[in-house]
Curated annotation (Swiss-Prot):
The keyword Mitochondrion applies. Component of the ubiquinol-cytochrome c reductase complex (complex III or cytochrome b-c1 complex) that is part of the mitochondrial respiratory chain. The b-c1 complex mediates electron transfer from ubiquinol to cytochrome c. Contributes to the generation of a proton gradient across the mitochondrial membrane that is then used for ATP synthesis. The cytochrome bc1 complex contains 11 subunits: 3 respiratory subunits (MT-CYB, CYC1 and UQCRFS1), 2 core proteins (UQCRC1 and UQCRC2) and 6 low-molecular weight proteins (UQCRH/QCR6, UQCRB/QCR7, UQCRQ/QCR8, UQCR10/QCR9, UQCR11/QCR10 and a cleavage product of UQCRFS1). This cytochrome bc1 complex then forms a dimer. Binds 2 heme b groups non-covalently. Pfam families: Cytochrom_B_C, Cytochrome_B. Its main location: mitochondrion. This is Cytochrome b. GO terms for cellular component: mitochondrial inner membrane; respiratory chain complex III.
Length: 379
């Protein structure tokens, strides 16, 4: 009799995705981040669900409801900090996952890549709205500053901002709708993840060499299930260390002050994972230009398959491209640092140079270096 996992309509899908899936024999730990992102999403949905049971999305009670969760709800403090720091782990895994895709040329699977970009936008939107919910000073002013950027859109800008706010400023209506969107978006993200995997399984995984590996495949289970389990263990250990020893390390002290529309914090800045994009936004003196640069800082990833000029897929055997890739990584660290600094000399000029270098590397230097490497192949 045939095994039920190979015949049952539902089990068959799971079997083809997680058990009998043919996988390349040489994929490294950089391929662990996809499953780690799935784990992060699961942690965020579960902890978020329990937080939503106790949270109230009203300007008068939101801040105290979060305090109540931490003080009075059984294990509320760990649920709250798992959720807050889980977001940081989510973005660490996201950045590493995207970086892996760029380094090893995974973006040539353009459908999978484009769904991935949509996922990145969706996760960023979710994280932004989640940051508004505790209704601290940085929540309120972050929401005010970022939503206000839409007013830069010609003709419809002001109306659009007021429509999103549900009034003439960030207030009760804004908080309520942000809570509603923050609740629904993770489920939309889950659906997009399934589409992402559907497209990935149409082609199969890439591998570090970038060479087609159809001749040498191994079953996903047990080889990669155990490898993923090790990744899970390491990531949960890191997350729990952060939550139990220094839960506020990555947060902003201003968010422990209840929101006050009459008192602006001296430095308005988002969470650390948005600082690179915030630095790019601030580096352009024009409001509309800044907003466009902000969107393009992520949307530029969609141009990656079009800008691939190399005859090789992966950067594994391309030293010039490797050097430029690591310069790009260093540039992103620089932008992250600048995003957290005040707008004054010398940070302004450093931010402008780093922002220029970011786009110049992706649009000009990396495609050009690939062409040079193509020539070097003939030597």
């Amino acid at each position: 009799m045939t095994n039920i996992r190979k015949t049952h309509p539902l089990m068959k899908i799971i079997n083809h995705s997680l058990i009998d899936l043919p996988a390349p024999s040489n994929i490294s730990a950089w391929w662990n981040f996809g499953s780690l992102l799935g784990l992060c999403l699961g942690i965020q949905i579960i902890t978020g669900l329990f937080l939503a049971m106790h949270y109230t999305s009203d300007t008068l009670t939101a801040f105290s409801s979060v305090t109540h969760i931490c003080r009075d709800v059984n294990y509320g403090w760990i649920i709250r900090y798992m959720h807050a720091n889980g977001a940081s782990m989510f973005f660490i895994c996201l950045f590493l996952h995207v970086g892996r895709g760029i380094y090893y040329g995974s973006y040539t699977y353009s459908e999978t890549w484009n769904i991935g970009i949509l996922l990145l936008f969706a996760v960023m939107a979710t994280a932004f709205m989640g940051y508004v919910l505790p209704w601290g000073q940085m929540s309120f002013w972050g929401a005010t500053v970022i939503t206000n950027l839409l007013s830069a859109i010609p003709y419809i800008g002001t109306d659009l901002v007021q429509w999103i706010w549900g009034g003439f400023s960030v207030d009760k209506a804004t908080l309520t709708r942000f809570f509603a969107f923050h609740f629904i978006l993770p489920f939309i993200i889950t659906a997009l993840v399934m589409v992402h995997l559907l497209f990935l399984h149409e082609t199969g995984s890439n591998n570090p060499t970038g060479i087609i590996s159809d001749a040498d495949k191994i079953p996903f289970h047990p080889y990669y299930t155990i490898k993923d389990a090790l990744g899970f263990l390491l990531m949960i250990s890191l997350l729990l260390t952060l939550v139990l020893f220094s839960p506020d390390l990555l947060g902003d002290p201003d968010n422990y002050t209840p929101a006050n529309p009459l008192n602006t914090p001296p430095h308005i800045k988002p969470e650390w994972y948005f600082l690179f994009a915030y630095a790019i936004l601030r580096s352009i003196p024009n409001k509309l230009g800044g907003v466009l640069a902000l969107v393009l800082s992520i949307a530029i990833l969609a141009a990656m398959p079009l800008l691939h000029t190399s005859k090789q897929r992966s950067m594994m055997f391309r030293p010039i491209s490797q050097t430029l890739f690591w310069i790009l990584v260093a540039d992103l660290f620089t932008l992250t640092w600048i995003g957290g600094q005040p707008v004054e000399h010398p940070f302004i000029i450093i931010g402008q140079l780093a922002s220029f270098l970011y786009f110049f590397l992706i649009l000009v230097l990396m495609p050009a270096s690939s062409l040079i490497e193509n020539k070097l192949l003939k030597w």
